[in-house]
Curated annotation (Swiss-Prot):
Pathway the protein takes part in: Amino-acid biosynthesis; L-homocysteine biosynthesis; L-homocysteine from S-adenosyl-L-homocysteine: step 1/1
One GO biological process term: one-carbon metabolic process
GO molecular function, one term: adenosylhomocysteinase activity
Name the record gives this protein: Adenosylhomocysteinase
SUPFAM superfamilies: Formate/glycerate dehydrogenase catalytic domain-like, NAD(P)-binding Rossmann-fold domains
Required co-factors: NAD(+)
Species for this entry: Methylibium petroleiphilum (strain ATCC BAA-1232 / LMG 22953 / PM1)
Domain of life: Bacteria
Subcellular localization: Cytoplasm
Any GO CC annotation of this UniProt entry: cytosol
Length: 477
């Protein structure tokens, strides 16, 4: 493949339609009223400006809620450049609103993979009009693609063979983008990486990548695992998916869920929320699991625990929520009923073996909704081409639950940027418990919750401070 990095344009952004900015701004204002955590953090830190001097490269779904996060980081003093971490997840009016306010954003709904990796490169250049000036000193990542780019690019500077054999369309475009950048500047990745203090990572998938690199001793900077903050994983992953999964299936298909058999692959926090949502609409919910503990949890909640092989020709709706690859394979889809609905609410599109379907006939019903036709004439309905269904076919999680996640991200950025000496390069950390509890406190008033206060005697009896933390780090919520 030929080089794919494009000449830098005269404007330092790329969005679908700037005329959508007013619409986006109106929705951002509404979202702010539902995001008390971020708004409280703005108020708390407005004077002290803890992120002054921070140059944050952001790779995270470009939604209305993300716009509130971006403007919170800026309100605390940061410079920000932003791209989406998924080719289908951008809300174009949100991107336009940020650009109209002066933020460099590179994202549009339905990006090509070539554009995706071009934009991921461009968010690392903080010079005037996107020129190759100084780089970021912080990364805010979702899924780990920005972090991956720095690490893989630096490896390729020393050993080009690491980008010589792509195994997927995604890798083909990524490797071509890296080759093009190296042809322009053979040390670009090393220079950009050298300035980076740390990364804060949003998702299970991205954290897995960080932990792998840390274990191998190859992680180039400090990292905070935001995903495993209780106020992220037990809220965003569970309650967020509980609302956004069925929203996306309904928007995409208008199908009646009641009475259907729905098979959820994976019973972690995302799977739990997905299963609850489908059962709430009176589907018969089946679960597949590899972990005996999660499988027993599902069974104790009344779900039928089966294998994908068992469910393939019986279920009507399939949802992958594992963080693994090839969970729903060609042989499973070939066995499915006509018009079975197949979707993924994990981060990457390889949970469903979409590559194995490329040889078949595809019939686009509407954007992000496709019939895939098998040789016998049977069709399955594939949503968002196997990528995140709740952002590809709907607008993602509600603002309130994203306030909790993004409050964690903001606090983690402050923590790493202002206290970098407390965190070791190459290690992955979680936020301290007292900060996790702080995020929860910031959201209680909005839902009318009243917190009981310990007496001195009670605090002494259980051996905690009256102001917390209230649980040991090992406590499972």
């Amino acid at each position: 493949m030929s080089a794919v990095l494009k000449p830098t344009p005269t404007h330092d952004h790329h969005v679908a339609d700037l005329s959508l900015a007013d619409w986006g701004r109106k929705e951002i204002k509404i979202a702010e009223t539902e995001m008390p955590g971020l708004m409280a953090i703005r108020q708390e830190f407005a004077a002290s400006q803890p992120l002054k001097g921070a140059r944050i490269t952001g790779s995270l779904h470009m939604t209305i809620q993300t716009a509130v996060l971006v403007e919170t980081l800026q309100a605390l003093g940061a410079q920000v450049r932003w791209a989406s971490c998924n080719i289908f997840s951008t809300q174009d009016h949100a991107a336009a609103a940020l650009v109209a306010a002066g933020t460099p954003v590179f994202a549009y709904k339905g990006e090509t993979l070539t554009d995706y990796w071009d934009y991921t490169h461009r968010i690392f250049d903080f010079g005037a009009k996107g020129t190759d000036g100084e780089g970021p000193n912080m990364i805010l990542d979702d899924g780990g693609d920005a972090t991956l780019l720095m690490h893989l690019g630096q490896k390729a500077e020393k050993d080009p063979s690491v980008i010589s054999k792509p195994t997927s369309e995604e890798e083909t475009c990524l490797f071509a983008a890296i080759k093009a950048k190296l042809a322009q500047d053979p040390t670009w990745y090393t220079r950009k990486s050298a300035q980076i203090i740390g990364v804060t990572e949003e998702t299970t998938t991205g954290v897995h990548r960080l932990n792998e690199m840390s274990a191998k001793g190859t992680l180039l900077f400090r990292a905070i695992n935001v995903n495993d903050s209780v106020t992220k994983s037990k809220f965003d992953n569970l309650y967020g998916c509980r609302e956004s999964l069925v929203d996306s299936i309904k928007r995409a298909t208008d199908v009646m869920i009641a009475g259907k058999v729905a098979c959820v692959a994976g019973y972690g926090d995302v799977g739990k929320g997905s299963a609850q949502a489908l059962r709430a609409l009176s589907a018969q919910v089946w679960v597949t699991e590899i972990d005996p503990i999660n499988a027993l949890q599902a069974a104790m909640e009344g779900y039928k625990v089966v294998t994908m092989e068992y469910a393939a020709d019986k279920a009507d709706i399939f949802v992958s929520a594992t963080g693994n690859k090839n969970v729903i394979r060609y042989e499973h889809m070939a066995a499915m009923k006509d018009e079975a609905i197949v979707c993924n609410i994990g981060h990457f599109d390889n949970e469903i073996d979409v590559a194995s379907l490329e040889k078949l006939k595809w019939d686009e019903i509407k954007p992000q909704v496709d019939h895939v036709v098998f040789p016998d004439g049977k069709k399955i309905t594939l949503l968002a081409k196997g990528r995140l269904v709740n952002l590809g076919c709907a607008t993602g999680h509600p603002s309130f639950v994203m306030s909790s996640s993004f409050a964690n991200q903001t606090i983690a950025q402050i923590e790493l940027f202002t206290k970098s000496a407390d965190y070791q390069v190459g290690k992955v950390y979680v936020l301290p418990k007292h900060l996790d509890e702080k995020v929860a406190r910031l959201h209680l008033k909005k839902v009318g919750a009243m917190l009981t206060e310990l007496t001195d005697e009670q605090a002494a009896y259980i051996g905690v401070s009256k102001s917390g933390p209230y649980k040991a780090d090992t406590y499972r919520y």
